[in-house]
């Protein structure tokens, strides 16, 4: 399932982080087992991230443990409406010592369209995937556009992009370009006011 591959690779904030050692693993489901690896600045906090991609009655969750920067840890959570009743959601929990506690996924609110829309897309192996209209709901009045890549030993650089409606703009910094293995890098982070449908 392409969406499953996307969510496993999507988490654009996962990065290796000083001399602290943290668990490193990825898996489908609620937990994973991997190995300890040393962090390097500025990603010097241990953390656990849950990602969920949901579309209608189908939802898939993945877990990611790694070293994170303080800016990512402060993000705590995000919910992006990518259109077609589909969401990408994340819950981030960082801690001084392993194991980090979990954050729960509350159910999505039954929100109604609010008269705004954004370009929506979720792409893997491309930085410019086909856009469609994401109808914003509830408190979603911002458009998010994130582009990045992750370098793996095989198949190499994996580009990805994410666009959709969001309730507030996250404070994220661009990453320095590099080809270090098992790292994610942000190349573009744009957040602006959502577009408003013309009143009939």
From Swiss-Prot:
Glycans are attached at residue 176. One of its GO terms (cellular component) is extracellular region. This is Phospholipase A2 inhibitor 1. Expressed by the liver. It holds the Pfam family PLA2_inh. One of its GO terms (molecular function) is phospholipase A2 inhibitor activity. SUPFAM superfamilies: Snake toxin-like (SSF57302). It is found in: Secreted. Disulfide bonds join 22-46, 25-32, 39-67, 73-94, 95-100, 118-143, 136-165, 169-191. Occurs as a mixture of oligomers. Tetrameric arrangement appears to be the predominant quaternary structure. Residues 1-19 form the signal peptide. Belongs to the CNF-like-inhibitor family. N-glycosylated. The keyword Lyase does not apply. InterPro entries: CNF-like_PLA2_Inhibitor (IPR050918), LY6_UPA_recep-like (IPR016054), PLipase_A2-inh_b-type (IPR016338), PLipase_A2_inh_N (IPR004126), Snake_toxin-like_sf (IPR045860). Inhibits basic phospholipase A2 isozymes PLA-B, BP-I and BP-II. Keywords: Disulfide bond, Glycoprotein, Phospholipase A2 inhibitor, Secreted, Signal. It comes from Protobothrops flavoviridis (Habu).
